[in-house]
Amino acid sequence: MRLNNLQLKNNLNLSNKLDKERIPEHIAIIMDGNGRWATKKGLPRSFGHNKGVSVLKEIIKASKNIDCKVLTVYAFSTENWIRPSNEVDFLINLFEKVLKKEISEIHQESIKIKFIGDLSPLPNSLKLLIKSSEALTNNNKKFTLNICVNYGGRQEIVKAAKEIAIKSSSGKIKPSDIDEQLFNSELLTKGSMDPELLIRTSGEKRISNFLLWQLAYSEIYVTDVLWPDFTESEFLKAIIDYQSRNRRFGGIESLSNESFEDSCYSSLSKND
């Protein structure tokens, strides 16, 4: 995607506002709005999906440029099978077409690619391509691209619970062994850090069964911009917004025990 001088200048200005010490290492994105984008333009929904692929390539590059380590994108959910069959077929064919075309460049860019989800319903040709692509890029360390295909957060949690139950009933583990670390090890995302930032395009304020366990403490950024219109500038705005927040993980902001007690005493005194 060619950028004009104004866009390049805008991207540079936004990049200069970033705190290089507070770049999120793992960013997750719900890429929403392809169909609506196409419909608004009087085009078939397939045009939106094709444009969405171009945008993803731009955002992968932007993620690497700011030294983000992991990008996880929601490409196809377990619920997406209920869409019209012609759209589902188009999307599955698009995955295969794009992966065939881009895998060499992905490898050359030292990107490790991983597909997350239940891949069993996919065509054999796509499953073989996914397997070979993951094997080819497995030793790449600079950047990881996780693509969630036929993925559902609830299904992932249920699967992990079943695996733990089987191991417990067979005596491989004791109930007392079960903790967050063990549960994490049974998830499809095992070995990957949790996202610090979730970006959702299209203005929808929900997480749509995406990474339900992993997003427990993620900052969430929602933009009204539809995914095909999502640019590097919009991406950088999300990072800047993230950096303006104070991640407390359930705690409180810079408040010592003494000041908390003083605050409580002061409130009680006012009520006397």
Curated annotation (Swiss-Prot):
Any Gene Ontology biological process: polyprenol biosynthetic process
Source organism: Prochlorococcus marinus subsp. pastoris (strain CCMP1986 / NIES-2087 / MED4)
Binding residue positions for substrate: 33-37, 45, 49, 77-79, 81, 83, 200, 206-208
Active-site residue numbers: D32, N80
Intrachain disulfide bonds: none
Family, as annotated: Belongs to the UPP synthase family.
Biological role stated in the UniProt entry: Catalyzes the condensation of isopentenyl diphosphate (IPP) with allylic pyrophosphates generating different type of terpenoids.
InterPro entries in the cross-refs: UPP_synth-like, UPP_synth-like_CS, UPP_synth-like_sf
Keyword field: Magnesium, Metal-binding, Transferase
Cofactor: Mg(2+)
Protein origin, superkingdom: Bacteria
Pfam family, one: Prenyltransf
Cofactor, how bound (note): Binds 2 magnesium ions per subunit.
Record-given protein name: Isoprenyl transferase
